[in-house]
């Protein structure tokens, strides 16, 4: 699941100029689903415009350099959910009682337990009111200083290749790389982990949940996009040159957005 005491020492890969700043989630009703996730995370709700609901910790001012705050944006979309999401959130707990209380509270908010073939595992697999999968982690996982989101999990075919790409695409530190999973985290050692988990299922549809990256102040988005393409990303042309972000896909086709520097 997450890095433990027997993991390799963190490795920092040079030449990085972006950081993970938010998770973007498509929603049929962004306000309603945003309300669920705001309650689940204990975060504040705002909106940058019609069809977009933004979730941030209380008192957060974007773009905040605090790496604990990997925020969540919900964007309205009429597209139906047709497959298991390849990106999901793991929520942190601190005790057996906390895990049980959180599962009960989330169920009361509209979440449902689901079976995706996980078997007998200590974490709880659930779906939000629109069917997006997420997990409530076992309290034994080392999730100190993550905030309510312990891990952002991305399904993949080759965790080692994902660690190479994302370790250079961002300024996050690689904590673990095996044939089964790779784990990164902010170089400051706080905030959620980013895990690439080996799964047998191929990618078949556009991801309903994706990562948003932001270059640092003083950098140029076009230059960063070129650097990411040189690392193995591919450009995605949406036919709209007016949007203030660049859409790319990682080497396994997972879409992500490169936002304006800030």
Feature roles, as predicted:
Residues 7-50, 56-115, 127-178, 184-239, ...:
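Glyoxalase I/VOC metalloenzyme domain signal
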Residues 119-121, 241-243:
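Short, small/polar residue-rich loop motifs at catalytic or cofactor-binding pockets
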């Amino acid at each position: 699941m997450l890095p433990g005491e027997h993991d390799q020492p963190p490795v920092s890969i040079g030449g990085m100029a972006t950081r993970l700043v938010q998770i973007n989630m498509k929603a049929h009703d962004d306000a309603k689903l945003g309300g669920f996730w705001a309650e689940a995370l204990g975060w504040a709700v705002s909106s940058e415009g019609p069809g977009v609901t933004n979730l941030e910790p209380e008192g957060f001012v974007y773009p905040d350099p605090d790496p604990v705050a990997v925020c969540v944006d919900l964007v309205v979309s009429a597209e139906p959910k047709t497959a298991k999401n390849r990106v999901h959130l793991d929520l942190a707990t601190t005790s057996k009682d906390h895990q049980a209380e959180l599962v009960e509270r989330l169920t009361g908010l509209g979440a449902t337990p689901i079976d995706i073939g996980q078997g007998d595992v200590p974490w709880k697999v659930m779906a939000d009111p629109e069917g997006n999968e997420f997990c409530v982690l076992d309290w034994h996982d080392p999730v100190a200083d993550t905030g309510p989101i312990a891990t952002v999990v991305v399904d993949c075919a080759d965790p080692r290749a994902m660690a190479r790409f994302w370790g250079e695409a961002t300024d996050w530190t690689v904590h673990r790389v095996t044939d089964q999973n790779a784990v990164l985290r902010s170089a400051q050692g706080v905030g959620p982990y980013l895990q690439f988990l080996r799964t047998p299922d191929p990618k078949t549809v556009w991801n309903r949940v994706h990562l948003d990256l932001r270059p640092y102040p003083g950098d140029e988005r076009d230059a960063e996009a070129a650097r990411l393409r040189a690392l193995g990303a591919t450009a995605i042309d949406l036919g709209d040159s007016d949007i203030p972000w660049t859409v790319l896909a990682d080497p396994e086709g997972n879409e992500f957005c490169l936002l304006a520097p800030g």
